[in-house]
């Protein structure tokens, strides 16, 4: 059985993520989606909790017709030491043979650890990016909804994600500066 790892922050998940996951599942039997920066939330760069992101991913993949029995989603907190982070990923995830990533630094870490690393499939990256979704949300621009699956938009609305992001971006959500 071939199992792959697909790490990302997914702040929030968008159609590009769904496309990439569907493409990777054409090449492997199972996929471990690692939701990184799991301890961060309620800040401008990371407004959603790990649980909310896992929920959004699950609903987005269900909406896209992905067989969820082939996907395992896990939270991965960051640590300051990158080799410790790599060990944590290996500890939290079921065994995997290949890593799909678009991040050159993540690719370097896994390659040096002996893993096969492949470029994650990209889908209109200039259009579909979590950064863009967050920027549109902060501005109150309804175009953000076109970039995410309907289920993700519904969750963001249900949890007050746009307001949370606007407040966080105003600088009130920086406990390390209090």
UniProtKB/Swiss-Prot annotation:
Residues in the signal sequence: none
InterPro entries: Cyt_trans-like (IPR004821), NMN_Atrans_arc (IPR006418), Rossmann-like_a/b/a_fold (IPR014729)
Keywords: ATP-binding, Cytoplasm, NAD, Nucleotide-binding, Nucleotidyltransferase, Pyridine nucleotide biosynthesis, Transferase
One Gene Ontology term, aspect cellular component: cytoplasm
Gene3D superfamilies the UniProt entry points to: HUPs
Chief place where the protein resides: cytoplasm
The keyword Transferase is assigned to this record: yes
Compartmental location: Cytoplasm
Pfam families reported for this sequence: CTP_transf_like
A GO biological-process term: NAD biosynthetic process
Catalytic activity field: beta-nicotinamide D-ribonucleotide + ATP + H(+) = diphosphate + NAD(+)
The protein's enzyme class: transferase
Molecular function terms from GO: ATP binding; nicotinamide-nucleotide adenylyltransferase activity
Record EC number: 2.7.7.1
Pathway linked to the protein: Cofactor biosynthesis; NAD(+) biosynthesis; NAD(+) from nicotinamide D-ribonucleotide: step 1/1
PANTHER family reported in the protein's UniProt record: BIFUNCTIONAL NMN ADENYLYLTRANSFERASE_NUDIX HYDROLASE, PHOSPHOPANTETHEINE ADENYLYLTRANSFERASE
Family the entry assigns: Belongs to the archaeal NMN adenylyltransferase family.
Protein's name in the database: Nicotinamide-nucleotide adenylyltransferase
């Amino acid at each position: 059985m071939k199992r792959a790892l697909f790490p990302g922050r997914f702040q929030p998940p968008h159609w590009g993520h769904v496309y990439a996951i569907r493409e990777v599942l054409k090449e492997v039997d199972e996929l471990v989606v690692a939701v990184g920066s799991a301890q961060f939330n309620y800040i401008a760069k990371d407004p959603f909790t790990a649980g909310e992101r896992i929920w959004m991913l699950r609903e987005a993949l269900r909406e896209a017709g992905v067989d969820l029995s082939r996907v395992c989603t896990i939270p991965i907190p960051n640590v300051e030491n990158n080799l410790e982070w790599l060990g944590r990923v290996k500890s939290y995830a079921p065994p995997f043979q290949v890593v799909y990533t678009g991040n050159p630094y993540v690719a370097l870490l896994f390659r040096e650890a002996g893993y096969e690393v492949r470029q994650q499939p990209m889908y209109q990256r200039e259009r579909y990016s979590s950064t863009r979704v967050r920027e549109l949300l902060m501005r109150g621009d309804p175009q953000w909804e076109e970039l995410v699956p309907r289920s993700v938009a519904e969750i963001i609305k249900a949890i007050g994600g746009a307001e949370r992001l606007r407040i966080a971006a105003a600088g009130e959500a920086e406990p390390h500066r209090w």
